[in-house]
Amino acid sequence: MKRQRAIELDRVKKTMLNIDWDDALGDEEVPELEIIATDKIPPREPTLSGYEPAVSVRSLRDNELDDHLKRQRSLLTRLGDKLADKGEKIRNRIGELEYEKQRRMFQQRTKMQDADNGCQILEKPKSSDVFMRASTASKDTSGQGTSGSKDVSRSTFAAHFSDNLKMGPQPVKLVNDKLQDLGRGSWISKANRDSIIEKNNVWRSLPRLSKCKVSLKNFYSESKDPKGDRRPNEAYGKGKPNESSPYLLVDDDDGDDDKVIGYETPRHWSLKASPLQSSSCRKKSDDKVINLDEDEPLSPMVVEEACELPEGLPEDIYYPSSDQSDGRDLVQVSLKDLKCLSPGEYLTSPVINFYIRYVQHHVFSADKTAANCHFFNTFFYKKLTEAVSYKGNDRDAYFVKFRRWWKGFDLFCKSYIFIPIHEDLHWSLVIICIPDKEDESGLTIIHLDSLGLHPRNLIFNNVKRFLREEWNYLNQDAPLDLPISAKVWRDLPNMINEAEVQVPQQKNDFDCGLFLLFFIRRFIEEAPQRLTLQDLKMIHKKWFKPEEASALRIKIWNILVDLFRKGNQTD
């Protein structure tokens, strides 16, 4: 029966479908595609690295590009296996930086060839050459053997392709469908479209990228650079906050001068208050601890507006003033030092040393705890490591010379000693806690690192050796009247505790200096006059919100601008 039915179906008469192709296609000729270089370039897609506030690789100078590469490789080596994504974002960032470095080399070589040949039109390299150069440059970035650093997207190719279109309008014959699709720019409007795979050019399938809802804007509203020139994108815009960000990112105006297609430029940004969410433990008056598994909204964090940098400011200022200090802790800050307070920049020693003195002389000038603290500057730890590792025959004389760093101060009479550490393009903090006479638990060393990047055991060992050397030196003289238990002082080399604490972690790779400064400030606010081992519980992962530390960038900027203005009035 089934066979008979199948035969009957085969006997059904098949008719031909008639299509009027002339009516369907029309008589109009398809115009030849022209690619025209314009002044305004569409905004780029989000960076492959996933860091929205990342520094634009195009805006970096050559030496800054090398510094960023060095830092990213160091981060990948130390933290790659510890991160949730196994360092994928860092490898992508390394790939972008390596490609930008190769692009500059290629552009410079092309210009030199044009100068030799007297040509005015740049020769367009083959697409395969471009991608093979980029993939070769990415192979040596991480040394991890993964494919993350070898990735080159079509967005990157578009950026290179558009750089060479600086001549007038001219017809271009596209080679194939892939380039035709790229030339029309249709790939830009398809935010969820997978990147095309080209195996022979070492492409790989990239994850789907959602279109960036907001762009970044410099928080310097109508600010000027140190020379008085007005910065681009000066006025604040209005935009909607990114829900996943603790900041309110302000959208840019149409006057975007970025000249790169293909991925998001970290434009100038503005920080405003935005509601945050986090899980927390709240302690009620009856000492009952309630753990909240679900996230709860927190009150908005108030962030200052960055003030304008006026013209005609002095080149340098000195802090603190002569009436606040005897001159031994004087810090010099120049206008060019303010650049490190730009978004995405790493804080430098002059700014960090300034804010440490500012906290000491202004914020906590009347605080008893701060008054009994000693603050070393950012250059001290390097000298400390040299002193404790010195192997010469004049070791004692070398240490006596090293003691000039705290001449006139008896360190063991202090409550706390703060030592900033700068190694491997990263900042962390050591706090030495001196107990009182009733506490026989010994001295305590705390290391606070917002990335966990610095070798804690090595730092503990260096600081211990430093304290033992100072103890040996002081024990040569008559007994001292110190606020330390006699039992602890007699056996001090063996009475030094290492406190392993967990602290809030930064959400990027450039706020480590801000976290160092916020560690100092928050510690002085909450620490007792003399710390015990039981007091260490105040330091934990939820000690403060990372956004609070990041917000110091604008605070310090405003403080310094105000001091420069006052310095100008004094002059």
UniProtKB/Swiss-Prot annotation:
A GO term, aspect molecular function: SUMO-specific endopeptidase activity
Main location: nucleus
Catalytic residues identified in the record: H426, D449, C512
Cell compartments where the protein resides: Nucleus, Nucleoplasm
SUPFAM superfamilies: Cysteine proteinases
Top EC class for this record: hydrolase
Pfam family, one: Peptidase_C48
GO process annotations (BP): protein desumoylation; proteolysis; response to salt stress; vegetative to reproductive phase transition of meristem
Positions with biased composition (Basic and acidic residues): 222-233
Its EC number(s): 3.4.22.-
Record remark: domains: The N-terminal regulatory domain is not required for peptidase activity in vitro.
Name this protein carries in UniProt: Ubiquitin-like-specific protease 1C
Organism of provenance: Arabidopsis thaliana
Lineage of the species this protein comes from: Eukaryota, Viridiplantae, Streptophyta, Embryophyta, Tracheophyta
